[in-house]
């Protein structure tokens, strides 16, 4: 409501307006909390059906392992929740929801020469992750993104690693990381063929963890399918640790 219009209201009317706004704000907050709790309850039911352990709160042990992955170094006010875990034939599979907030400057030309806080906008980004911790497994830190997805890491100078003998993989994905030689040793034909079966794969990996990232929170009816596909896909990395040439000292 415009300030001039508020100034024309009587004190009693203004009081009702303020109370109304406060009530609506409070209701919105309560509804948000309710839906968050309801989603956690629904995910716990799914986890129980699959024989998975569930926690609505973050797994600090796993989160500590992921701190060096690109996504987990972005933004501020990050949050890991609704963690589902189980041991599979490939390793410890974890599925969880993750979000972070990021404040960006508006790109409109009229804002570029100012520093007013109104020139900035904070956005919250939501993701669904599946991670696989593989015993006796060690890999270089790397990220794989679908081709055409430019991000901060590449824009800051890191180069896409290509394989001339596997054009399907190189033309479909961006692969990058600090240890190019180690990454080239790690990626064999079998692994690149695995990516050819999942062209939208967005993967971050390092040490004994491989993570598959999806944008947004998944629909409840899609969770079971995602878990099964993630375990199969991430399990395809396990063979790489069998080759001594792929091991880092």
What are these regions (language model features)?
Residues 1-4, 28-30, 115:
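N-terminal functional modules and adjacent low-complexity/disordered segments of proteins
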Residues 1-13:
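Short, strongly hydrophobic alpha-helical membrane anchors
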Residues 15-23:
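Hydrophobic H-region at the start of alpha-helical membrane spans
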Residues 24-50:
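Transmembrane-cytosolic junction motif
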Residues 42-249:
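Charged, low-complexity intrinsically disordered regions
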């Amino acid at each position: 409501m415009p300030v001039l219009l508020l100034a024309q209201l009587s004190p009693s009317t203004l009081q009702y307006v303020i109370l109304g706004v406060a009530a609506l704000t409070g209701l919105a907050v309560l509804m948000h909390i309710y839906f968050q709790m309801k989603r956690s309850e629904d995910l716990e039911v799914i986890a129980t059906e699959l024989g998975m352990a569930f926690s609505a709160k973050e797994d600090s042990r796993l989160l500590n392992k992921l701190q060096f992955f690109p996504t987990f170094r972005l933004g501020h006010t990050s949050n890991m929740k609704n963690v589902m875990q189980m041991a599979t034939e490939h390793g410890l599979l974890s599925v969880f929801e993750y979000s972070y907030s990021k404040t960006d400057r508006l790109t409109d030309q009229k804002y570029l020469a100012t520093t007013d806080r109104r020139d900035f906008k904070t956005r919250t980004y939501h993701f669904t992750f599946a991670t696989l911790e593989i015993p006796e497994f060690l890999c270089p830190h790397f990220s794989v993104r679908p081709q055409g997805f430019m991000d901060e890491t590449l824009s800051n100078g890191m180069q896409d690693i290509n394989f001339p003998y596997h054009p399907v993989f190189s033309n479909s994905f961006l692969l990058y990381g600090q240890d190019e030689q180690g990454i080239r040793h790690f990626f064999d034909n079998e692994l690149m063929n695995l990516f050819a079966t999942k062209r939208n794969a967005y993967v971050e990996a390092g040490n004994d963890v491989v993570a598959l990232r999806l944008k947004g929170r998944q629909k409840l009816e899609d969770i079971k399918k995602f878990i099964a596909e993630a375990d199969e896909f991430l399990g395809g990395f396990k063979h790489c640790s069998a080759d001594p040439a792929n091991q880092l000292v």
